[in-house]
């Protein structure tokens, strides 16, 4: 059998909802999203949904998030893709504590959030971030459990200083 199942969130079924179903029906395998776009969902809302999946799957979730693509966010969804680095830093500042079952008090430039989520049976989950550029990789190293690359193995991504990343990097 499979050791893990990673669900994309690309114009079809919602990845987190899919994983909640898979997690209830298929025991033992690890589950992950690759990736859920951040712009359309408030970090507190995605934390609540991911904690629900964690409860349904007995803690087998790794949440993969990413910025998506400018054309998708601006042209298809009509949202601003301005300042993506600031956006992901604010996003992770809120999602980080909530993913570990902790309350959050954060006032950033893109988001301000004060609160907690009490999802009965949920276990903390790791967050990995789709990142290829040096700024995104730096933020990911500081604030997430790892990274997910797109159409490239991490060993094929030539970024100076990558060997200095202090945390493990996830490369599915």
Segments predicted by a language model, with ranges:
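Active-site-adjacent structural elements that line small-molecule/cofactor binding pockets in enzymes
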Residues: 2-172
């Amino acid at each position: 059998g499979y050791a893990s199942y990673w669900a994309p969130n690309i114009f079809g079924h919602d990845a987190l909802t899919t994983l909640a179903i898979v997690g209830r029906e298929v025991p033992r395998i690890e589950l992950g999203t690759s990736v859920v776009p951040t712009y359309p969902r408030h970090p507190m809302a995605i934390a609540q949904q991911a904690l629900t999946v964690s409860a349904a799957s007995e803690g087998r979730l790794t949440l993969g998030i990413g910025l998506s693509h400018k054309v998708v966010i601006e042209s298809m969804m009509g949202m601003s893709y301005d300042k993506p680095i600031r956006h992901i830093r604010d996003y992770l500042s809120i999602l980080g504590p909530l993913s570990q079952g902790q309350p959050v008090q954060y006032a950033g430039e893109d988001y301000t959030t004060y609160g907690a989520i009490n999802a009965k049976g949920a276990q903390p989950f790791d967050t990995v971030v789709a990142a290829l550029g040096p700024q995104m990789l730096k933020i990911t190293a500081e604030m997430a459990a790892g990274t997910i690359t797109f159409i490239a193995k991490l060993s094929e991504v030539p970024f100076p200083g990558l060997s200095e990343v202090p945390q493990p990097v996830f490369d599915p």
